[in-house]
Swiss-Prot record:
GO terms for cellular component: plasma membrane; proton-transporting ATP synthase complex. Signal peptide: none annotated. This is ATP synthase subunit a. Key component of the proton channel; it plays a direct role in the translocation of protons across the membrane. It comes from the Bacteria. Its main location: membrane. NCBIfam families: ATP_synt_6_or_A. It comes from Pseudarthrobacter chlorophenolicus (strain ATCC 700700 / DSM 12829 / CIP 107037 / JCM 12360 / KCTC 9906 / NCIMB 13794 / A6) (Arthrobacter chlorophenolicus). It is a multi-pass membrane protein. It is found in: Cell membrane.
Length: 266
């Protein structure tokens, strides 16, 4: 854990880790790679890992798939059938499978970094990456809506059908703020805040264990065992949340695309 690697406090008092501990040191000394952090390196490595895995899985396809081919096909089928087909449906879903597939596994791998010893840093615990992904999705579904419905899409997205005319002055501003302001912000912050909060809890638990073990009191040393048990439970819960957040982000993307494609029926 990063938390267990934090230096002990000289004051003898417990000082919980903060946001600063979420920033890993630069890759090269003396500012030689300023602006290129370890988080960026992890992002690039995630692309390599994903590409290598699926290239190897699809390289020698057989009628009776081996373990690697089966894993690749199952992963692809999960996104294709479980998200794209179920949410978007019709004949439109297939063209959006590459986007949803890339989003899911890109987020998944970068989240799983937080569960790997000695790395333990989910990339999206930094808000910048979450903003970029949410921004890509935001402009994508708007472009899809305009392509399908023309500029009339903005009317379809902000003026609900069947609403009495005298309520529209209240409803339209709410729809504009909800669809074009709140939606992209919550899409990014949901991923970022969950990863940040979960990782901070694990870091605090790790620092607490270190602090208790270093105390002279036998009672406090024994308490560290309980904290360790809680930390392991939180670690497992965080690992589950890492997978769920990749799924939720991709699922919401599919919902937004479906809404843009069928704006005239909402």
């Amino acid at each position: 854990m990063i938390a267990l690697a934090l230096p002990a406090q000289d004051s003898g008092e417990f000082t919980p880790p903060g946001i600063n501990e979420m920033h890993l040191p630069a890759i090269l000394p003396w500012g030689a790679a300023e602006g290129f952090s370890k988080q960026m390196l992890l992002v690039l490595l995630s692309v390599v890992f994903i590409a290598v895995f699926f290239v190897l899985a699809a390289r020698k396809q057989q009628l009776v798939p081996g373990k690697l081919q089966f894993a690749g096909e199952a992963a692809y089928g999960f996104v294709r059938n479980g998200i794209a087909k179920d949410i978007i449906g019709g004949r439109d879903f297939i063209k959006y499978v590459p986007l949803l597939f890339s989003l899911f596994f890109f987020i998944l791998v970068n989240n799983i970094y937080g569960a790997i010893p000695l790395i333990q840093l989910p990339t999206f615990s930094h808000v910048g990456g979450a903003y970029v992904l949410a921004g890509i999705v935001y402009f994508t579904w708007i472009a899809i809506g305009i392509k399908k419905n023309g500029l009339r899409y903005f009317k379809l997205a902000t003026v609900p059908s069947g609403v009495p005319w005298f309520i529209l002055p209240i409803v339209i501003p709410i729809e504009i703020i909800s669809n074009f302001v709140v939606r992209p912000v919550t899409h990014s912050l949901r991923l970022f805040a969950t990863m940040l909060a979960g990782h901070l809890i694990v870091m605090i638990a790790g620092s607490g264990i270190e602090y208790l073990v270093m105390q002279e009191s036998i009672l406090l040393k024994g308490t560290s065992v309980l904290v360790l048990a809680g930390a392991i439970a939180m670690y497992m819960l965080e690992a589950l949340i890492m997978v769920l957040q990749a799924y939720v982000f991709t699922l919401l993307t599919a919902i937004y695309i479906e809404g843009a494609l069928h704006a005239d029926s909402h």
